[in-house]
């Protein structure tokens, strides 16, 4: 029995570790916005906020374009080979990050004029890398989400496994901001960062992912044939005919939009406040110094946000008697109240606490969306991940609004709107209307 449990645990650990990498690199991508606004976009004029949020836009564009391929590849070649392809895209994306720095340093005169803005050519290479990284993250999650949800690990239920994996993912997102400020940009004040500092860290990360890929190739990851159509099998129904799934895609679109808007743009709001003479302090300290390293107040905000997600997911992983619908309703109501108070008081520390309440939204929405889909699950996962494109849309909308209004403060109302849509899904949209919603024998609602 112990041997069988150990065999069962192996694939779970491998996929959880890769999910950690996905979370870590997703946040590294987003946290580069603040420093690269200084290093790349000093001459971008009044469009700085719009241009810098394109980093998140191109990352999540990868989800919209490439997620459906993940579901098809799972049906065609299985979970493991699709996962290996995602790691290949990840290596390519990290290589492009390195190339963007090298190109800018080597060819400083290669500048693109867009209206009154002047943007280094290397910045567009970085955006290409962001797209490839988003593609890698999308394909990885298309594999990991349905696999972990359906994988039978003794003593656990689906939403628990999802929350455990998401908690480890959140640990990666929590430590990433300090990786950006201390290891990539050397702990310098944000006004002093240089493009050349990107080269070595991203090259090291690429080598690390290569090693992870080679290790995964040698690991045994059993296929879960009951979660995907057999090769050549035609599915009788359109995946969009499942109402609770379709509305789940809409809900995840708004959820990821809210999550990424906070995680990526809260540091930009902090920089704006500092420039207006309203610099934030952490227990009375304007700068977080360890020796000569400046950890940065903006990085602390992001760390509290992503750390709150990790803590919330760890707590939720023990709640095996509370249904996903009740969990989602409760945390969404709390998130709406918190954001309303934060916007009214212009308090970024309260916005950073939103991560705790958003922590279980992903796993609850996914679990409710794929309930009873059976052989449609793999295809559903690919379509579901298209909804993550919300992470591209809402941060950019927020950046445009900040440029138009001259402040980030009231742009957080966008996040409150997103939370209201999620609340609708929790209360109404996630309910399976009748037995025709399920391709097989109807299961009790969760």
Cite the ranges covered by each PLM segment:
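Intracellular juxtamembrane helix-capping segments at the cytosolic ends
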Residues: 139-153, 359-375
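Glycine-rich segments within core transmembrane alpha-helices of 12-TM secondary carriers
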Residues: 157-185, 382-395
């Amino acid at each position: 029995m112990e041997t069988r449990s150990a065999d069962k645990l192996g694939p779970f650990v491998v996929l959880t570790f890769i999910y950690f990498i996905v979370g870590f690199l997703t946040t590294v991508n987003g946290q580069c916005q603040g420093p690269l606004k200084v290093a790349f976009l000093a001459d971008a004029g009044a469009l700085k906020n719009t241009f810098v949020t394109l980093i998140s836009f191109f990352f999540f564009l990868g989800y919209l374009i490439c997620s459906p391929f993940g579901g098809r590849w799972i049906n065609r070649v299985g979970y493991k080979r699709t996962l290996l392809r995602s790691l290949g895209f990840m290596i390519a994306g990290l290589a492009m990050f390195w190339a963007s720095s090298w190109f800018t340093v080597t060819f400083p005169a290669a500048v693109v004029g867009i209206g009154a803005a002047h943007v280094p050519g290397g910045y567009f290479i970085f955006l290409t890398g962001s797209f490839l990284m988003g593609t890698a993250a999308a394909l990885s999650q298309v594999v990991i989400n349905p696999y972990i949800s359906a994988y039978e690990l003794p003593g656990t239920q689906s939403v628990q496994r999802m929350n455990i994996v998401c908690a480890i993912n959140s640990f990666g997102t929590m430590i990433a901001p300090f990786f950006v400020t201390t290891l990539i940009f050397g702990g310098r004040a944000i006004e002093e960062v240089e493009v050349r500092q990107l080269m070595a860290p991203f090259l090291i990360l690429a080598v690390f992912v290569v090693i992870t890929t080679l290790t995964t190739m040698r690991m045994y990851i059993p296929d879960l044939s009951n979660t995907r159509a057999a090769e050549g099998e035609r599915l009788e129904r359109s995946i969009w005919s499942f109402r609770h799934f379709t509305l789940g895609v809409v809900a995840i679109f708004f959820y990821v939009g809210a999550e990424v808007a906070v995680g990526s743009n809260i540091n930009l709001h902090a920089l704006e406040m500092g420039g207006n003479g309203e610099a934030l302090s952490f227990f009375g300290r304007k700068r977080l110094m360890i020796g000569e390293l400046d950890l940065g107040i903006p990085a602390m905000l992001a760390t509290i946000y992503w750390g709150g997600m990790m803590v919330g997911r760890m707590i939720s992983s023990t709640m095996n008697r509370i249904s996903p619908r009740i969990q989602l309703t409760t945390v969404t109501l709390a998130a709406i109240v918190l954001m309303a108070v934060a916007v009214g008081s212009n308090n970024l520390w309260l916005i950073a606490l939103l991560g705790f309440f958003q922590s279980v939204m992903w796993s609850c929405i996914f679990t409710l969306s794929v309930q009873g889909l059976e052989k449609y699950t793999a295809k559903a996962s690919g379509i579901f991940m298209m909804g993550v494109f919300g992470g591209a849309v809402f941060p950019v909308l927020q950046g445009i609004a900040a440029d138009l209004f001259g402040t980030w403060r009231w742009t957080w109302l966008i996040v409150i709107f997103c939370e209201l849509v999620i609340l609708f899904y929790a209360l109404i949209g996630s309910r399976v209307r009748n037995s025709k919603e399920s391709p097989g024998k109807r299961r009790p609602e969760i």
